[in-house]
Amino acid sequence: MPTKHKALVIVLLIVAASFAVAAEDGPEEVIRGLYKAHQPREHRELNLRNHAVLSKYFSPELTKLFLRNVQVERDCPKGDLCGLEFDPILGSQDFDDHLAFKLHITEATWPQTGRFEARFKLFNEEKPEQEQVLVFQLVQVKNGWRIDDIIYTKDNASLKAVITAIVKEAADLKK
């Protein structure tokens, strides 16, 4: 086998192995992977408009809601604000551009399986009691663990509820 073919086979095997590991990731690894992929302070943001990207981290139901939000934004009259008006992964509109991001994840105690709390600062000078606290509800689907909802503890709101309300409001305005 020529050297080029061997190199190609090795690369393909490595890529396939990385996908196999990703499918086997536990719920905490899914959350960590989400924050590793989504780093707006580093100008790397997750494409929340892409089905393939969304389904890597989110449940089928939440993926559909994200895509409905995309449609609401697309149908929005010019000059209006429509759809999510905050970063749903950070749970905020603002953050320090030079943030020293440190993610702390803890698992909820039984019987709340698949529930994890993520804590992090949005601004470097924040005290621990000012940290952003998001609760992730994960479900196991055929591809592994996926995020099914995010609860924003400071606002007592859930991502599913927020997007559902946005979609409903947009539908009501069309009537």
Q: Can you say where each PLM-predicted feature lies in the sequence?
A:
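Surface-exposed, charged secondary-structure patches
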Residues: 59-128
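Non-catalytic interaction/Regulatory regions outside core domains
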Residues: 35, 51, 55-63
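Low-complexity, intrinsically disordered terminal/linker segments enriched in charged
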Residues: 112-133, 141, 148-175
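Short, aromatic-enriched amphipathic alpha-helices that serve as compact interaction elements
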Residues: 25-43
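Surface-exposed patches in mature extracellular/periplasmic domains of secreted proteins
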Residues: 42-50, 54
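N-terminal signal peptide c-region/cleavage motif recognized by signal peptidases
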Residues: 15-20
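Bacterial N-terminal signal peptides that target proteins for export
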Residues: 1-9
